[in-house]
């Protein structure tokens, strides 16, 4: 993200990452906070399902829902006493968070059921050197989800990046260095998989944005 900011506006990059200017913190739960908590809940529940050796698409709805509620309660308690419980609006946001996380994990299971990919890691943090000679840069980030599909000789890697807002991949922006996030994630993920699966060919399969939403279909009485 910081590299994309530099490509768009070097001054903005300097003010944000050089001078470390930040907006004044307010006692409120922002959309950014909402996305951070939602990501954390999805990661925690998916990790628990994997740790228990359960299937993402065979787990019962009741058990999945209970795991989501427990995770949301634990994570939102971090917001001291709690900013999320000081109004009816924020209480509604907690309920919405539960619904979105539950639907996302359910949808993930349905998608996995239709293919051969399986989740490899969630929320993978990485540090990676890029460049050559004296022109090297350290790139760091967090990949929401890495899936793999493997046989005796090859491992295919797929990147899933969760977004709470609308985000489309644009190859032109990637060319100009404005939208490189998924490409960097793939490079980092392939290095991770190569280390964990020595002796196998590691191949890129695809990079995808996953829009976290609870869509409502509009319809007239006639339709």
Q: Predicted segment positions?
A:
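Non-catalytic protein-protein interaction segments used by genome-maintenance enzymes to assemble
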Residues: 119-194
């Amino acid at each position: 993200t910081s590299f994309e900011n530099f490509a768009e506006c070097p001054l903005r990059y300097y003010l944000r990452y050089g001078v470390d200017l930040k907006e004044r913190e307010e006692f409120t739960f922002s959309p950014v906070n909402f996305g951070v908590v939602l990501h954390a809940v999805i990661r925690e529940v998916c990790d628990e399902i994997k740790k228990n050796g359960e299937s993402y698409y065979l787990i019962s709805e009741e058990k999945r829902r209970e795991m989501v509620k427990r995770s949301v309660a634990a994570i939102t308690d971090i917001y001291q006493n709690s900013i999320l419980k000081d109004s009816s609006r924020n209480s509604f946001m907690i309920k919405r968070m539960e619904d979105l996380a539950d639907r996302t994990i359910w949808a993930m299971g349905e998608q996995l059921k239709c293919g051969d990919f399986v989740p490899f890691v969630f929320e993978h943090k990485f540090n990676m050197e890029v460049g050559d000679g004296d022109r090297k840069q350290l790139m760091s980030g967090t990949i929401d989800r890495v899936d793999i599909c493997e046989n005796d000789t090859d491992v295919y890697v797929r990147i899933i990046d969760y977004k709470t807002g609308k985000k489309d991949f644009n190859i032109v922006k990637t060319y100009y260095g404005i939208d490189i996030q998924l490409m960097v994630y793939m490079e980092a993920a392939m290095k991770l998989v190569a280390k964990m699966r020595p002796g196998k060919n590691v191949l890129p399969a695809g990079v995808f944005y996953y829009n976290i939403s609870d869509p409502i279909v509009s319809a007239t009485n006639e339709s």
